[in-house]
Structure formats: C-alpha cells, structure tokens
C-alpha cells in the first residue's frame, strides 16, 4: 500500500457549509475526513438544500477524498432511560442517517449511549432497538460505526463485550461496525502502548467482536492514565500512549489499511504534521 493510498485525515470543520470540511481536509494533506453534518450541540439538525448537495458533490470531485465519516450529535443517547429524550435521540439519529445518505457518506460514527445510572442491560437493549428503527433509512454504502468509548460517567461501549452485544443484536438487519478511539480504549483499560500490547488487545477484540467488524480509528494520544476512564485527548506522542502505538497501527497488516481520523487538540497546523509523521511510519 503506497503512501498516497493510506487513509489518513482528521475531524475537519464544516462551519459555513459541509463542503468546507472537504476543503480543510485537502489543506492538511488528508485522503479522508470526519466531520459534523449538523450542529453537534443542537437537537434540530441542518436540512440540506439542492445547492448544498451540488456544492458538496462538486467539491468532493475536486478534492478526491474517500471513506468519509460523519460524527453524530453529542446530544443523542440511543439508550436513554428518559422516554422523552430517547424519542428525541431516535429522531435526531434518523435525521443524521438521512443527511449521510444525501451526501453519500460511508460511515456514521456514534457514541452508543449512556445508562444515566439506570440498568446497563436495559440501556444496551434500548440501543439495539434504536438502531433497528433506522433500518428503513439506510441506503447506499452507509455503515453505522459504534465508537468505543472511554467509559466516562455512565456511558456504555467501553468494554468490547458491550459492543459485541449491540452488534449481535443488529448485524443481521443493518450494516454495523466499530471505530476504535485510541485515547478511549486506553483510558477504558486496554493497553496499547507497545506493539505487544496492541497485539494482545487486537486478539481480544477479534475473540470478542471479530476483526471483520473493525472499520476505522480515531487517532489520539491521552493525557490521562491507563484505566482512568477520563477522556482527554493529547497531540500524538505528547501523552501517556506514545509514538510506538501509532507506529504499530501504520505498520500492522490488521490495521494499516483502515481509515484513521485525528481528533487531537491543535487544529490544522498540527494535523498536517501528524499526518506526515504517520505516513513516515508506514
């Protein structure tokens, strides 16, 4: 796999129009991007005009980016025990699926949900039910990706077993997979600091979930310790995970080809340098 074929990018800004996320991706030397299709802190989502979609399509052709990923709203909790907020979450998620379909996006990355102190098993069952409700709206190449979480607060999805439970509940009905956030799984208790640690963790993932369900990575270092369950991203090589971990991801045959999206604090100037450094490892 040549450097030009490596799928590397970052979470770029769609402020002023979704097409701008593509332009920012090109600016940092990315071959792929993640972005918000709508304001991530509002229930009411953006509705695309014909002009929005045409501008997106023409910019996409110019930039030649592939394996595009949307990140859903932070407000959405598909396992919410509060019925009113669960219904709002399901509606917002459905709208997100529709926007992704309109843009021809490949992946919709989402945080599974949070139990808010209620029964965790009920939360997981509610997430499965919520996902099955969007089945009629999924078209084209869109695949839903569960993001492995940090386990902060009452969020679920920080254990591979929880992700496997959700996948097993929907895999026969809709396209599903996992996006591993390196910071998240590290603070959730999975050691990835060395090649041997990564190998052990990937073998565990394969045993519990199955490597064919691993579709993407969020690439972040962590300012917090292994197992701390506190989600704080750091620039690559400046946190508790370290460069060996990211070098492994760029070299190992199980992970090298998968899309990787930076969410490190520092913005476009840092991302350009980090993408270059990751390419050098490959």
Swiss-Prot record:
Enzyme class name: hydrolase
GO biological process, one term: base-excision repair
Enzyme Commission number, as recorded: 3.1.21.2
Keywords, ordered alphabetically: DNA damage, DNA repair, Endonuclease, Hydrolase, Metal-binding, Nuclease, Zinc
InterPro entries to which the protein is assigned, alphabetical: AP_endonuc_2 (IPR001719), AP_endonuc_F2_Zn_BS (IPR018246), Xyl_isomerase-like_sf (IPR036237), Xyl_isomerase-like_TIM-brl (IPR013022)
CDD domains associated with the record: AP2Ec
GO molecular function, one term: DNA-(apurinic or apyrimidinic site) endonuclease activity
Annotated residues for binding of Zn(2+) 1: 71, 111, 147
Gene3D superfamilies: Divalent-metal-dependent TIM barrel enzymes
Cofactor(s) it depends on: Zn(2+)
Cofactor binding description: Binds 3 Zn(2+) ions.
Reaction(s) this enzyme catalyzes, per UniProt: Endonucleolytic cleavage to 5'-phosphooligonucleotide end-products
Keyword Zinc: yes
Keyword Metal-binding part of the UniProt annotation: yes
SUPFAM superfamilies attached to this UniProt entry: Xylose isomerase-like
HAMAP family named among the record's database cross-references: Nfo (MF_00152)
Summary of the function given for this chain in its UniProt record: Endonuclease IV plays a role in DNA repair. It cleaves phosphodiester bonds at apurinic or apyrimidinic (AP) sites, generating a 3'-hydroxyl group and a 5'-terminal sugar phosphate.
Family affiliation: Belongs to the AP endonuclease 2 family.
Protein name, entry field: Probable endonuclease 4
The encoding gene: nfo
